[in-house]
A protein has these predicted regions:
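AMP-binding/adenylate-forming core of the ANL superfamily
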Residues: 202-224, 228-230, 295
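Gly/Ser/Thr-rich phosphate-binding loop
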Residues: 134-190
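AMP-binding/adenylate-forming
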Residues: 52-59, 75-130
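Conserved C-terminal "lid"/linker of ANL adenylate-forming enzymes
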Residues: 291-293, 306-358
Length: 358
C-alpha cells in the first residue's frame, strides 16, 4: 500500500511495478501529454485500442467531482489496473481535484488498509462483494462520498448486501468510449431501478433498441452501444442485456441477463453461494440452447425446484435446457467475468472429449 499526492513533484520510491506505473502516468499527465491509449476490457469481445484526449478525461473527472462533492485532500482508493479506463480515471480524478491517492495492488480480494478513511473508489462487482462480506473492511468507507461499481452487472446478492449500508454506493454505466461512467443508480440508498445520466449526457435508442450516447465526453458524437435498453422520457434507462449475447433458441430470443436475475434470486432463497451465468451453446435441434453455467467443482442437482421457480417468472422456452458446472470461470485482467472465453473453453474441451471417444 502506498499513499501519494499525484500533483506533487516528488514521489516516494515505488515498491511494486503497479505503483511505478501509476507514478509514470501522473508524470505524463503533468507534462501535458494530450493523447492516451487504452484498451477496452474484452469482456464482450476482442479488446481494441482507443485513443482519448486529456480534455475528455479532465471533463469526466470534473463531472464526477461536481456530482459527488469532491474536495482537495479527500482520499481516493485505487485498486483497479490503470491500463483500463475505470482504473486510470481514479488517478485523473485525484490529479484534477488534488486528492490523496491510496494505491493497492489490483485484486478481486483487495487488501484495504485499516484506519484510512476513503472518500472515493471505483470497483468491479467481485471487489465490492468481497468488501461487503467483510465487516473489518467496511469501516474505511463510512464517510465515503461515492463507491462506484461498474464494468459488469451486479448480482442480486451484491445488491442486497449494498442496501444494508448507509454510505453511498452507485452502480455506474459507461465504457472506454465514454471515458468512464455517464450514468448512475444508487444501490445503497435505493430510489428506483433506473440509471440516470450525468448532466450534459444525451441518450436515445437506435432501430434495434440499443442505447446511443452523446456528450462532451464523446466529443459530441453519437456512440452506438450493443446494449439493449429501455429508455424513459426523462432519460432514465435500464440495460436489458447485450445484443450480441442474445440466444436465438428455436426462434425464441432469450436475453441471458433477464434469466440470470431470477436464478440469482433462487440461489439466495436456497442459500446457494456460487457464481453463475446463462449463455447459448450450439444445438442440433434448437440452433442454440440456453445453458446455465455454475462455477463449482461438483455438480449442482437443482432439478425440478429451479425449473418450477423459474416458471413463475419466465416462459418455459426461456428456461435453461441444461446445467453445466465448471471448476473455474475465466476472468479478464480487469477482474470481470469473461463468459465468452469460459464458454469457448468448455466447448473446446467438450469437443476434445468427444473426439477421444470416437
Amino acid at each position: 500500500m502506498l499513499v501519494i499526492s499525484p500533483k506533487s513533484n516528488v514521489f516516494p520510491t515505488p515498491s511494486t511495478p503497479f505503483e511505478a506505473e501509476v507514478m509514470e502516468f501522473c508524470k505524463l499527465w503533468k507534462a501535458g501529454i494530450e493523447w492516451f491509449s487504452f484498451h477496452t476490457s474484452g469482456s464482450t469481445g476482442q479488446p481494441k485500442a482507443i485513443r482519448i484526449h486529456r480534455d475528455q478525461m479532465r471533463h469526466s473527472a470534473l463531472l464526477t467531482g461536481e456530482w459527488l462533492g469532491l474536495e482537495a485532500g479527500d482520499r481516493a482508493l485505487l485498486c483497479l489496473p490503470i491500463k483500463f479506463i475505470g482504473g486510470v480515471m481514479v488517478v485523473v480524478r485525484a490529479l484534477v481535484w488534488d486528492l490523496q491517492l491510496v494505491i493497492i495492488e489490483p485484486s478481486n480480494q483487495p487488501e484495504i488498509p485499516p484506519n484510512i478513511p476513503i472518500r472515493l473508489t471505483s470497483l468491479v462487482p467481485p471487489q465490492l462483494q468481497y468488501i461487503l462480506q467483510h465487516d473489518s473492511l467496511l469501516a474505511s468507507f463510512q464517510g465515503a462520498k461515492g463507491i462506484l461499481v461498474g464494468g459488469a452487472a451486479i448480482s442480486v446478492e451484491i445488491e442486497n448486501l449494498a442496501m444494508k449500508q448507509d454510505f453511498p454506493i452507485f452502480l455506474t454505466y459507461g465504457m472506454t468510449e465514454t471515458v468512464s461512467h455517464i450514468a448512475y443508480r444508487p444501490i445503497s440508498l435505493k430510489t428506483d431501478d433506473y440509471l440516470h445520466p450525468l448532466p450534459g449526457v444525451e441518450l436515445k435508442l437506435n432501430e434495434e433498441d440499443c442505447l446511443c450516447i452523446r456528450s462532451a465526453l464523446t466529443n459530441n458524437q453519437w456512440i452506438e452501444t450493443n446494449d439493449l435498453a429501455e429508455l424513459k422520457a426523462d432519460q432514465g434507462f435500464r440495460i436489458l442485456g447485450r445484443k450480441d449475447f442474445i440466444i436465438n433458441s428455436g426462434g425464441m430470443k432469450i436475453i441471458p441477463s433477464q434469466v440470470e436475475k431470477h436464478i440469482q434470486a433462487f440461489f439466495i432463497e436456497k442459500g446457494i453461494s456460487a457464481l453463475s451465468f446463462v449463455a447459448g451453446i450450439p444445438d442440433d435441434f434448437y440452433g442454440q440452447k440456453a445453458v446455465l453455467f455454475i462455477e463449482s467443482p461438483n455438480f449442482f442437482n437443482l432439478g425440478d425446484p429451479l425449473k418450477q421457480y423459474l416458471l413463475q417468472h419466465l416462459s418455459s422456452k426461456q428456461i435453461p435446457k441444461s446445467i453445466i458446472c465448471l471448476p473455474k470461470f475465466i476472468f479478464n485482467s480487469n477482474g470481470k467475468l469473461d463468459s465468452l472465453k469460459t464458454v469457448a473453453l468448455y466447448l473446446q474441451s467438450s469437443s476434445k472429449e468427444s473426439h477421444a471417444h470416437d
